[in-house]
């Protein structure tokens, strides 16, 4: 069963992280009115987090699913348990591409291994998936910053950028995808203003505005 956590929420906090034999997630269903972490201790906890959109965004869903496999194998690393965990997690969001990609990667890494080493290997592979997303976010930010610098040379006043949905750190394991260059530009001192379009079903624009507000990036929600 999911349990609340007293972990503080900071500007640089990850959306999920391992803590011992459990995983902490930022419960996005409570945002922007309440900031709280929830502890995932079982496969069922991870499945619920994905299904209920406590975690959302393709990269974050994939990483959470990977950790869900690790949570499942912590108590039973048999072939049957691995197959059950895979099926359970795939059913949470059948159309989520990163979910299936992450589970395919976990299966490929774990199925050939003896059961005695599977649990540790599952945690290692899940962490590798999280770290790969961190690196991808950083690379997107770096390359995007170069483009924004070029645009700034021919722009009078702040750069005007429009975003759709939420593609920031709430949707990933790092600084985000589409928002990563915006954060990099703001940190580099470029004048920038973001027009945040509202979307459904989870008011993702409001989540983007919440992110940008915490980072001090000028923005308008429309």
At which residue positions do the language-model features occur?
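C-terminal binding/interaction regions
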Residues: 4-21, 90, 94-160, 164
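Short coil/turn connectors at secondary-structure junctions
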Residues: 13, 19-22, 50, 56-58, ...
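Long amphipathic alpha-helical segments
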Residues: 14-116
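Glycine-rich oxoanion-binding loops at beta->alpha junctions
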Residues: 28-45, 137, 199-222
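Buried hydrophobic packing segments
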Residues: 65-73, 103-106, 144, 148, ...
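Acidic, glycine-rich active-site loops and adjacent beta-strand->loop/helix elements
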Residues: 67, 89, 167-169, 198-203
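Internal active-site segments that recognize and position negatively charged phosphoryl groups
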Residues: 143-192
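Glycine-rich phosphate/diphosphate-binding loop of Rossmann-like nucleotide-binding domains
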Residues: 171-221
């Amino acid at each position: 069963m999911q349990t609340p956590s007293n972990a503080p929420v900071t500007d640089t906090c990850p959306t999920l992280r391992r803590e011992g034999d459990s995983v902490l997630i930022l419960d996005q269903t409570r945002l922007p009115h309440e900031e709280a972490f929830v502890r995932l201790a079982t496969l069922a906890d991870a499945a619920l987090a994905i299904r209920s959109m406590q975690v959302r965004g393709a990269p974050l869903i994939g990483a959470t699913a990977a950790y869900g496999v690790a949570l499942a194998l912590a108590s039973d690393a048999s072939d049957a348990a691995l197959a059950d965990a895979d099926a359970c997690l795939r059913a949470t969001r059948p159309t989520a591409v990163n979910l299936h990609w992450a589970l395919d990667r976990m299966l490929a890494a774990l199925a050939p291994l003896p059961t005695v080493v599977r649990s540790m290997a599952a945690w290692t592979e899940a962490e590798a998936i999280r770290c790969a997303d961190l690196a991808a976010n950083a690379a997107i930010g770096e390359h995007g910053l170069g483009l924004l610098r070029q645009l700034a040379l021919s722009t009078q006043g702040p750069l005007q950028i429009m975003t759709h949905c939420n593609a920031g750190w709430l949707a990933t394991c790092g600084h985000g995808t589409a928002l990563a260059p915006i954060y990099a530009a703001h940190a580099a001192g470029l004048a920038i203003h973001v027009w945040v379009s509202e979307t459904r079903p989870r008011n993702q624009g409001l989540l983007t505005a919440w992110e940008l507000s915490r980072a001090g990036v000028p923005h308008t929600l429309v």
